[in-house]
Amino acid sequence: DEDLIQREDMVVTVSHGGYIKRVPLSAYRAQRRGGRGRSGMSTKDEDFVANVFVANTHTPMLFFSSIGQVYKLKVYKLPQGTPQARGKAMVNMLPLSEGETITTIMPLPEDETTWNELHIMFATSNGKVRRNSLDDFSQVKANGKIAIRLDDDDALVGVATCSEDDDVLLAAHGGKCIRFPVTAVRVFKSRTSDGVRGINLGKDDRVLSMSVVRHEKIEVEERDAYLRWSNANRRGEDLSDTGLSPERLAEIAEREEFILSVTENGFGKRTSAYEYRIAGRGGQGIINIETSDRNGGVIAAFTVAQEDEIMLVTNGGQLIRCPVHDIRIAGRNTQGVTLFKTSDDEQVVSVAHLEGTEDDGEDEDEDETEESEVNSDLDAE
């Protein structure tokens, strides 16, 4: 009986290769963060920890797959192990068909009566988007159910919770992107629709990723003045005549988000989200990053914080871990800088976003936050 399952905080760890496990949070509380942390998962050489979150044993999780299916499990159903254990392959836990992969794992509020207050946004490789109430996924059978109907040449590339105070950013392989308000997509009642057009793609282009970006109410003149000021700051120049007060500059800077873009040949850059103007849904979009034979097409684009890290994976099995703060901030109309020197026959095929994993190398007090202790789990990978 589910009521007999003890309520306990768990650290859920997911590897890039599709292995998952849960570990009691208490197993991490005894770990001080003075060095590089502890081993977080025993993985193959080509695998690594790609996602970590803290959840209660009774927290429901939705697993969205590349073919548009959704599966549901509560945390206590996951295999429990030690911090060093590899976990269990999701393909052996969920009724996945051949070639079907899990693209998004979403922990949800335990109180399902609140789900009707939350929305979920879908994005497909053909540029379609759809918004539903999260409550539409409160009942999911053991064999899963359709989350979104996809054409044979389409795939689900992103799923995220959102509010009507957010924007959606779609990034395409050819270097274009589009940003539009969540409210530009009506709330669908159906799960079998493929949604509406989010971006008008060029021939043979495809959407690689979707990000939910905070909607900012900022005048164009303010935005442009701030960007001139911040660019001058990074160059070490003094630009005092911005027309904005120091308080307003600080306020805009405090709310600034950055979009990280990575290309097939190992190039990347960070760009202020203020550079991505809000447009109407369904347009052709604007330049996100200049693509060429030198840097290749876009493989991923998403919002990042200064303390995050990314992991690049190549088709040759090479891995490189890169702190976000080491990646140059540049404008949209640039090719980026080399993050990883690929060989002639090698390309980056995947980029994992490791949130808040940067290690400052300093000892912390014993009453450090649970999140810091969990993040040290990633440092050893």
Enumerate the predicted regions with their spans:
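C-terminal interaction appendages of subunits in large macromolecular complexes
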Residues: D1-E381
